[in-house]
């Protein structure tokens, strides 16, 4: 089991999320949704998770992702915290790595 690391928010904003080896984000026709595929199975994603994970390209930082989604959804409140919490959960599930 991966150890839980603590990252300050200011440091987290400058990390770049990338998908871990063995985990693939893709549209799954049979599920009619985006999924995370991994050797043991798949996880069907909701719309919010999909919007966040679509931003992961190995170049954008967490701050960039927050800025992009905030521009798409200017009336959303608490978006930055929601994105950060989701990315932390995705990392704890080993879907992504925050570099």
UniProtKB/Swiss-Prot annotation:
Q: Which terms in the Gene Ontology molecular function aspect does this entry carry?
A: quinone binding
InterPro entries, A to Z: PQQD, PqqD_bac, PqqD_sf
Specify one Pfam family: PqqD
Q: Which pathway does UniProt place it in?
A: Cofactor biosynthesis; pyrroloquinoline quinone biosynthesis
| Alphabetic keyword roster | PQQ biosynthesis
Coiled-coil residue windows: none
Gene Ontology biological process terms from the UniProt entry: pyrroloquinoline quinone biosynthetic process
Give start-end of the signal peptide.
none
Please indicate which superkingdom the organism of origin belongs to. Bacteria
Instruction: Tell me the HAMAP family matching this sequence.
Output: PQQ_syn_PqqD
- Protein family membership: Belongs to the PqqD family.
How the protein assembles, per its UniProt entry?
A: Monomer. Interacts with PqqE.
What does this gene product do? Answer: Functions as a PqqA binding protein and presents PqqA to PqqE, in the pyrroloquinoline quinone (PQQ) biosynthetic pathway.
Name the UniProt record assigns to this protein = PqqA binding protein
Organism name: Acinetobacter baylyi (strain ATCC 33305 / BD413 / ADP1)
Q: What's the gene?
A: pqqD
């Amino acid at each position: 089991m991966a150890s839980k690391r603590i990252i300050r928010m200011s440091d987290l904003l400058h990390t770049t999320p990338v998908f871990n080896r063995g985990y693939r984000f893709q549209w799954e026709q049979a599920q009619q949704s985006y999924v995370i595929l991994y050797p043991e199975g798949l996880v069907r994603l909701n719309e919010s998770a999909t919007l966040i994970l679509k931003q992961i390209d190995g170049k954008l930082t967490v701050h960039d992702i927050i800025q992009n989604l905030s521009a798409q959804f200017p009336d959303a409140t608490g978006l930055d915290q929601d994105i950060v919490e989701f990315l932390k959960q995705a990392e704890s599930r080993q879907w992504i790595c925050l570099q």
